[in-house]
């Protein structure tokens, strides 16, 4: 277990919007989350009634009120690399204020809501577990949720998990799986002036490209538990050629398959192996999808509290990790996911208030929390 630094930076949870800005202006690129984890841990240890544990640079805080149900609320502390987009600044568009900067959308808005809720919600109608974890944006082997599950899976026990991914305040059920793989195409080198002496591996990619092109013509939509997912099969990278006057002796194409949760990871892999049976395949990564699970009673009641029509999560998120643990999970948080990872990443400030209000309404504690909407602007 990692210990907090002797003098962690202070995060003031009095005002939601100011807390949000402080979190954003606290750099925490993947594998550099330690100081922010220290600050988050310090906040949580000051809250009466929370049992706090730390594993690496992930922090877990739990209530123990004896409620019959437990809800887990999770958000990752890390961001993708900074590109001259910190410190943050406020930008107004059509009367709406946005905080602009790295991590605003993905996902320090969600982290701010969760940390504010943990600091102010003292008598929820369900026991709560808050998880602030490291390394979501990089390879799965570093993922904080995975490390917690390996070291202390009991900390993740819950009847429902809410992952505070940016969904623009809409509940998004489940997530699609993802498979990345390469196909190798062999050729034979020759001088380009005598090309007939060789075999051009780049040209021999054509059948693969034709399969990909033909695949785009079919309906990519898959209905799962009432939600309409959209699959994708796309070439994403290509490696070929040794010199401008040499016929390419080999080529390697990378393909990404995004598949709906009506199939397992194993079924998705089999489908790709059959589709591209004529070429050697190397699987780079394969992540399972998660079914929506919105028919579960807790999820149904939360969707009702949010009050909007739920949708599917097209990308892969850590709800799949909870699904593998047998825990129903959904995505819900402030921020438009279209802005995630962009250089001008931003989040509408009012979306934090809206997300907080939905959670408070569902947890039946309207009178306990004073929302940050009044005087909450940074």
What are these language model-derived features?
Residues 92-97, 117-131, 154-157, 212-222, ...:
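Phosphate-handling active-site elements
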